[in-house]
Amino acid sequence: RNEGLSTQHNPEFTMLEFYWAYSNYEHLMDVTEELIAGLAESILGEKKLLYKGKELNLSPPWPRLSMGAALRRFAGLSAEQTASSAGLLEAFRERGLEPPKAAVAGEPVYGLLLSALFEELCEAHLDQPVFIIDHPVEISPLAKQKPTDPRFTERFELYIGGMEIANAFSELNDPDVQAERFLQQLAAREAGDGEAHRFDADYVRALEHAMPPAGGEGVGIDRLTMIFADRASIRDVILFPLLRPERADAAFEPAPQPATQPATDAAGG
């Protein structure tokens, strides 16, 4: 991906992605925690490990928290603050934080405010395994909405060691609803949301040919390896990590050429 370098990001990375027909995000959470806990037991002989000096317990079941619940637990927000756009804006002001421009370009967008505040205040506290569930529809254009509250979707992100390890959701398989979501994403992009999706006509057309109910998931193998190997940087677990050039023109500098050798030396004589 054409993104920056950090201890958790590398443009070239390894990911396990899969769809599971007739599954959903609840089932995938069960599968994911059993898979990773079993992996730990196979590699380490137990379901506990040390990562950056902290003991992590990978024994299932893992907690499942909404973004609002995480903000209340880890950042001290009240239930009233997490329930509305006005409350979230109040929380931004109290902490001297700027809300994302796309969230306040017009009428405040609850989902964008909620997710931005969660990323700012909660992610660093998520050391022990936890599923952050029911993401706002504004940031989850490919996920099914929750029938009990259409502001949210059947989506989770798994965090371990303060890092996002997996992302999954119940797939949206209605082509008409998906097309409407893409139109909403285009409006969000015009309002300044650089992460909003473009309209994918090919994907909508594929859904028109029918897709069964399904769950889809992506697991970051490099970050998971960081956890098991107790490494603080993704560079330590990638065979050929991309290096940041020391000078702006370094990437275009030709490799040094060897000095000219006598013919007898070049031939091994």
Q: Which residues fall in each region the model found?
A:
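Class II aminoacyl-tRNA synthetase catalytic cores and aaRS-like
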Residues: 1-269
